[in-house]
Amino acid sequence: GGFDNPDPVCRTRDFRPKTFIPRQNPFYVALPYNDVSRGEHKAEASRVIPWFRREYAGKGQSVCKGRWVQIVYNKRSCFAQWEDCGPFTTEDWPYVFGDKPPVNTQNKGAGIDISPAVRDYLGITGGTAIVHWRFVEFYRIPRGPWSKYGDNNPFVNAGLGAGKKSLQSREDRLRRQQEAIQRELLKDPAKLRRELQG
């Protein structure tokens, strides 16, 4: 890792920092919501996050971090992972998952922060720009410079492949249910005999 220097002269032609090979995907964004607070999911998380139930992997484990977003600027499209929260708030679920404008009023009402790689790929110059963004499923994302780097990137780390987390969580749930049934049966030997006899 290292400092993701935003100065364009400090970036390579494939949109990464010149001084190091990034261990995290340099194509990332921040959105003004965090689904986890104090080690637990926020009360509204399961209700407002469309993929919550499918991606749930355990108490306090974010279902938002690493989610893919498509960003469009001047008819150019880029893909990035949601890796941070902001700008300026982490509570704005009506904007992130709904149709409300950002509650933030600073920086011309910014509703998304983009990484230097996203900025440069889209050709954004200056401090602010109006972009359009939306969530996208991993299987819909074409290969591009966003698919080259990062231990957190399923293009690079196949162990993070789409659906793997939800499959693992389903398998874990089934295993826990089976273990609970086994514990109950072991508490009552007569019931266990009945179950074994069919």
Predicted regions and their residues:
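Secreted/periplasmic proteins
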Residues: G1-L196
